[in-house]
Amino acid sequence: MVENQSTSIRKYPKRIPYGMMNFKAVIEDDCYYVDKTPFVEKIERANKFFFYIRPRRFGKSLTLSMLEHYYDINRANIFDKLFGHLYIGQHPTPEHNKYLVIKLNFAIVNAELNDYKKGLDDHCRIAFNFFCDVYAQYLPKGIKEGMNQLDGAVKQLNFLCRECEKTNAKVFLFIDEYDHFTNKILAEPNCLDKYRKETHGEGYLRTFFDTIKAGTDSTIARVFVTGVSPVTLDDLTSGFNIGTNYTLSAQFNELTGFTEKEVRDMLEYYSTQYEFNHTIDELITIMKPWYDNYCFALKKYGKVTMYNSNMVLYFIDNYVNNDCEVPDHMIDENIRTDYNKLRMLIRRDKEFAHDASIIQQLVQQDYITGELKSGFPAELIGNPDNFVSLLFYFGMVTIDGTLEGKTKFIIPNEVVREQLFTYLLDTYKENDLSFDSYEKNELASHLAYRGEWKAYFQYIADSLHKYASQRDHQKGEYFVHGFTLAMTCQNQYYRPISEKDTQEGYADIFLCPLLDIYSDMTHSYIVELKYAKSKDTDAHIQQLFKEAEVQVNRYAQSEVVTSAVKTTQLHKIVVIYKGTEMVVCEEVNNQ
């Protein structure tokens, strides 16, 4: 007889839920879940028709999925399994598992204006049929057959609401990425008139939302809607006066994304599962400039900042699966893909060529001001305040307090900074200015490893002059600084720190070496950029050089610089432009 021998089952570290949007899968697959369930209490006490806008890849879909599982009457039997170890499982609210759930995900709806009605109808038909199947015991008999005799999402939703009322069934309606296809429509030129027809008056999309509103009088008890921008929300819900937009509410500032404490807790856990090569503080120091610094409520400014949750998970996943080494690339390629989707919409800042261009102004002075709008119609998207707000909702800028009675916005982190500078360079390319990628990359490598700086800055100067010669209005110090900064931001070996980031002075650009990624690079740089008008004398150029020489030596002693250069050789470079011609590019010695 063979005796059973007890064996211990190996316990693996919790999975990292990078890219996962299904709450049930996250829990059942033993993933690390940052507990956002305390917000359920606040959501339940809030208006029953809840609108919430956040940038892409900020955890909206997973949060929506968590709420879906929490309120679904069919999942009452697994409530303890899913939520027992979380805050809300130990402090359940009265409404948990009390609703029939309809979930719509507009991200998979065909985004073409001419076909979107069919796409919406097809998506809703599938969702409504699923609803009828899984909740059959709570619904009148024959509801599915009756619904399928009707054409279109509007008629079918209206029918479902009437039928559900007969059995007193209460529905929680979730709509994820409600604005997915309308954002794409708006990005297309000459589509604004067609878009307006669909979102106003008797337009189909407007009628669909009106049907939801009508359903709230009978069977739709709660609605939770997520999206990326408030544009469509404003167009669709004027008159939908039962809903509340909680996007800018301080109490929901931390609903999605991660606080620094949440990031630290996650790192602490994985440090017990893997042999980290860095301390927690060191990893936070590496991650913070790239992923942190979002603020979505003015009252939260100075109190808490939010990390992009997707990027944090990307970093930790790559770190623990790469022998606990910092990833070679700090930016997830999926983020770049999402940026490209937004790019056409951002191009509504069509006055780029003008010095007052909002994005160019943001790059040049490192901030912009404006009034943060909770919503605005698409036809007013070109209004400066509305465009600034659009950049905020897309995550391209974030709240940095107030300035002269207006909200002050800054670029939140290096991930976004690179995206914005990529946008600028792409715009230059569209204006017949091409950049040889191989040549640029070779120059960047030689800058970092060989200390060959002159050719690198000459390449930037040649590119700048070529573009400016085609655009007479592109003149002035702001343009020169913005162009140079955009070019240096494309250098993979450095994180450019510009202007106000150095507290002891205003070094135009400190090329901070990314030694955590490229540990063998040997050179770092401070670039003091000066500008003279075309008519200025040589004596004035000499005076600018003397000023720059003093300044760059002083800046080299700042804590930001001394703590970052480490083993690299620090070069102090003075670059002076006279108009759009670089007339000085010299290294200065210590004084």
Give each language-model segment a name:
Residues 174-176, 206-207, 221-228:
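Structural recognition of the conserved hydrophobic beta-strand(s) that form the central parallel beta-sheet
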Residues 2-75, 80-88:
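Walker A/P-loop-proximal flanking segment of P-loop NTPase domains
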Residues 560-591:
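Domain-level recognition of nuclease-like catalytic cores that cleave nucleotide substrates
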Residues 159-166, 194-221:
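Substrate-engagement module of ASCE P-loop NTPases
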Residues 232-239, 246-317, 362:
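Amphipathic alpha-helical segments of the small helical/lid subdomains adjacent to P-loop NTPase cores
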Residues 19, 35, 69-133:
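P-loop NTPase motor core
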